[in-house]
Amino acid sequence: MSIEIRNINKQFGQFRALNEINLSIHSGELVALLGPSGCGKTTLLRIIAGLEQPDSGSIIFHGQDVSVHDVRKRNVGFVFQHYALFRHMTVFDNVAFGLRMKPKNIRPSKSDIEKKVHELLNLVQLDWLGDRYPEQLSGGQRQRIALARALIVEPSILLLDEPFGALDAKVRKELRRWLSQLHEDIDLTSVFVTHDQEEAMEVADRIVLMNKGVIEQIGTPAEVYNHPASEFVYHFLGDSNRLKVAQTEETILFRPHEVSLSVQAQDGYQAVTVRDIRPLGALTRLSLKLGEQSELIEAEVAKDDVSLEGLQKGDVIQFKPKRYNHDWEI
């Protein structure tokens, strides 16, 4: 099921949440709406679902204009950040709920519902928890059950609003990998909202970067990271450093891993003072002070990098951005 979003505008009082949003989502694609709080990503997701009405513009599902259809007629599955499971129902009953609530003339038989629930519980790898209650599950298990409940009605589109936001970091990583594999298995057009750059980069086929109600860039994870369309995109997708080029108004941007260090003076390198050294597993992060520049430079190097040998706070070391070979002295 493809999605076409055409000229969508939405305003709340004096606040313009969405400004002329245009986006095409291909059938079977997994797309991330990524951006800071207040950028409009959740509002856009709710408009796609039919939970919110735009002030102007159209939502097209597979060639059909559904702009005037409410959420019940759009056949979308929606997964919220906070699970929204019924506490008084078992896992089995929570998953079965959507089918049991269908009108009698289109409701599957009891045996068909049971079969479908078992299929979905197997799909989310929790078939052994059917008789448990939500309070007996971990956060990650609850979110999988919420996803199974959304999928059991066979939606044409799956929408997820920060589905892993309420989980701890380790569980989020595990569920990201699982969701990516699940999407490959079911091949369902899916859109998810996140403010987590790593989550979007790891899971999505394409990323839609949003800021202040507009789309800054659309592309694959590699495209938006390696070829950012704006300074906002560059900074939002990871840690970055900024330097002014000597005797010009040019500013260069580079990431912490795009730094070369040397204990010996070399052409193109500048002396910097080490302000902080932080081991981060396989990497070591350094904060470096260059001349009179107020912003510290962040550098990341392998923990066995020769430049780290015996290095301490307050030492002077040589530094340059790897990507720039011209004279950028300050």
UniProtKB/Swiss-Prot annotation:
SMART domains, alphabetized: AAA
The entry marks the following residues as binding ATP, namely: G35, P36, S37, G38, C39, G40, K41, T42
Q: Which UniProt keywords apply?
A: ATP-binding, Cell inner membrane, Cell membrane, Membrane, Nucleotide-binding, Sulfate transport, Translocase, Transport
EC number(s) from the headed UniProt entry? 7.3.2.3
User: Is the Cell membrane keyword given for this protein?
Assistant: yes
Q: Which residues form the ABC transporter domain?
A: 3-237
Cellular component GO terms, alphabetical: ATP-binding cassette (ABC) transporter complex
Q: Does the keyword Iron apply?
A: no
- Pfam families in the record, alphabetically? ABC_tran (PF00005), TOBE_3 (PF12857)
Domain of life, source organism: Bacteria
- Catalytic class of the enzyme: translocase
Alphabetized SUPFAM superfamilies for the sequence = MOP-like, P-loop containing nucleoside triphosphate hydrolases
Instruction: Give one GO molecular function term.
Output: ATP binding
The record lists the catalysed reaction(s) as: sulfate(out) + ATP + H2O = sulfate(in) + ADP + phosphate + H(+); thiosulfate(out) + ATP + H2O = thiosulfate(in) + ADP + phosphate + H(+)
Record's subcellular location: Cell inner membrane
Q: How does it sit in the membrane?
A: Peripheral membrane protein
Q: What does this protein do?
A: Part of the ABC transporter complex CysAWTP involved in sulfate/thiosulfate import. Responsible for energy coupling to the transport system.
Question: What does the subunit section of this Swiss-Prot or TrEMBL entry state?
Answer: The complex is composed of two ATP-binding proteins (CysA), two transmembrane proteins (CysT and CysW) and a solute-binding protein (CysP).
Recorded hits in NCBIfam families, A to Z, give: 3a0106s01 (TIGR00968)
Please state which protein family the record places this protein in. Belongs to the ABC transporter superfamily. Sulfate/tungstate importer (TC 3.A.1.6) family.
Any idea what this protein is called?
A: Sulfate/thiosulfate import ATP-binding protein CysA
